[in-house]
Design a protein with these regions (language model features):
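C-terminal/domain-terminus segments
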Residues: 115-117, 121-138
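Conserved thiamine diphosphate
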Residues: 14-29
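Generic hydrophobic, helix-prone segments enriched in Leu/Val/Ile
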Residues: 24, 80-84, 136
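Catalytic beta/alpha-barrel core
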Residues: 26-35, 58, 123-125
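Short, well-ordered coil/turn segments that N-cap beta-strands
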Residues: 23-26, 51-55, 118-120
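Active-site-adjacent beta->alpha loops and helix N-cap segments on the catalytic face
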Residues: 3-6, 32-47, 129-133
């Protein structure tokens, strides 16, 4: 969500126009996110600027916090690391597991409160493994 703004609006406008001209189904798919408020604000700002493409929000599945931090660094999800630091501020908490439940609850309530948004689905990054993800959300 914190992507460079240079050319971003033009790129998204091109994708929207392309989808209308070609009838191609274009979906905006995000990296894994941690802040539902920022996600919904971003989605609303897109709508205000005329970008009404459907959005699928990336969600980090249940995993060890150290694994999640590794993927965050590897994927360049810098601002998201700050959120993790704020929620897991001491070293002892680094040994715990991460669950996306709070993020999903917040995202749910924010999107249900504003049904005129373009967030359609979430997709999971199974950093803790497919089995763990399915056991948690099956």
């Amino acid at each position: 969500i914190e992507a460079s703004k240079i050319g971003l609006k033009e790129s998204l406008s091109f994708k929207k126009d392309f989808s209308q001209i070609t009838d191609a189904e274009i979906i905006l798919t995000t990296q894994f996110c941690f802040d539902a408020h920022k996600v919904v604000d971003w989605s609303n700002n897109l709508l205000k600027s005329g970008i009404d493409l459907p959005i699928h929000i990336g969600v980090a599945g249940p995993t060890k916090l150290t694994t999640l931090l590794k993927y965050s660094i590897d994927c360049g999800v810098g601002p998201s690391i700050k959120i993790l630091e704020n929620n897991y501020s001491n070293v002892g908490k680094l040994l715990t597991s991460y669950s996306p439940s709070k993020f999903l609850d917040d995202l749910s309530s924010k999107t249900l409160a504003n049904p005129n948004n373009n967030i359609q689905k979430v997709h999971f990054y199974p950093f803790g493994g497919i089995k763990e993800l399915l056991n948690t959300y099956n």
